[in-house]
Amino acid sequence: MFALCDVNSFYASCETVFRPDLRGRPVVVLSNNDGCVIARSTEAKQLGIAMGEPYFKQKERFQQFGVVCFSSNYELYADMSNRVMTTLEEMSPRVEIYSIDEAFCDLTGIRSCRDLTDFGREIRATVLKRTHLTVGVGIAQTKTLAKLANHAAKKWQRQTGGVVDLSNIDRQRRLLALVPVEDVWGVGRRISKKLNALGIRTALDLSEQSTWIIRKHFNVVLERTVRELRGEPCLELEEFAPAKQEIVCSRSFGERVADYEYMRQAICSYAARAAEKLRGEHQYCRFISTLVKTSPFAMNEPYYGNNAAVKLLTPTQDSRDIINAAVKCLDKIWRDGYRYQKAGVMLGDFFSQGVAQLNLFDDSAPRAGSEKLMEVLDQLNAKDGKGTLYFAGQGIPQQWAMKREMLSPRYTTRFSDLLVVR
């Protein structure tokens, strides 16, 4: 038995938690460089504001209706997510963190001693008490059904109280008959068009299809979905995320970059961030790549995009080695006379241990005390905030930095941003 817990309008809700004056007002959160809408409060949805709407096109409309806009505050969202997940892990024996705002909980054994709907309400109340965030809880025998139950809990929140238990077969069939097939987890727009052409329009229709026919005309993934809709568990709980195969840190610039020095600072910053993520995965890498590109949509400007890579002889997780390699790659592909829109650094070819055959002629041979130094660097930045310690190559006035003109304070991670109660 699974429970899917999903925070309602997560990014927008994180902003209103610390701004009670915004409750009841439409709130939207914008993407990188304040580009387009990526999160909306319930009030913003009621105004018809769609996901992905460009901010510059809707700015006057937002002002007309009193819409409050925020730049993406990823540091705040990550910390609030961690608080939610920690609460869920205390209440459930096993938890799979599926995304920043949702997680699957294993309810095996709980049904024998607790009413599942009551337990779902307890989850909602506990998360609300600790974080002031509201979650929807969908309970069912499979992950796919739990997704549908969660969808119903959020869509009909007033009637359900934000908790839907689909362990009852009759209730399952009633809900499946109401859900369009394109809203089923794992069924995309392209597949739904094919299903509609076959007369399969609802989740109930899909659940009643022959698994053999579905596998023949589609694939084994959709067959698993059919079985899951019937209550046959095909997807297990994944408590530990699989090891990453690559790490990418890339950004679009707040302003176009035409100066090599500014680009080098950006590449140093992205390489340092990628190295920090690499150490967070307890991995070492050998492959390091740098990319740069101009905007393909810029009027009367030539397009240029390129990348270069190096492969180290000895795996590393030292930021200094990764920054050095990334800058060497930049030097290979940099061209004067262009206004660059985006750059990034990618790491690959991972090793779980920094052990490999050493080479006498390796310029990136392991540095003495490297692991200890990187450990101290990460600890200080985790304790006092990202960017407390940084490399000189990253620069101080970062004119290329991502534009975030409506950024809220990092209330939970920066002492300087703590709320003052008067």
What residues fall within each predicted segment?
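Short, charged/polar, Gly/Pro-enriched secondary-structure boundary elements
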Residues: 112-114, 299, 352-358
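Short, hydrophobic beta-strand segments
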Residues: 103-109, 307-313, 356-362
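C-terminal hydrophobic structural anchor segments
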Residues: 327-383, 387
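Short, charged/polar surface micro-motifs in flexible loops or helix N-caps
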Residues: 10, 33-36, 295-298, 350-354
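Short Gly/Ser/Thr- and Asp/Glu-enriched loop/turn motifs at secondary-structure junctions
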Residues: 98-102, 140-143, 283-287, 338-342
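DNA-contacting surface of Y-family translesion DNA polymerases
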Residues: 183, 191-339, 355
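Gly/Gly-Pro- and Ser/Thr-rich, intrinsically disordered tail segments characteristic of DNA damage-repair
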Residues: 1-227, 236-237, 367-422
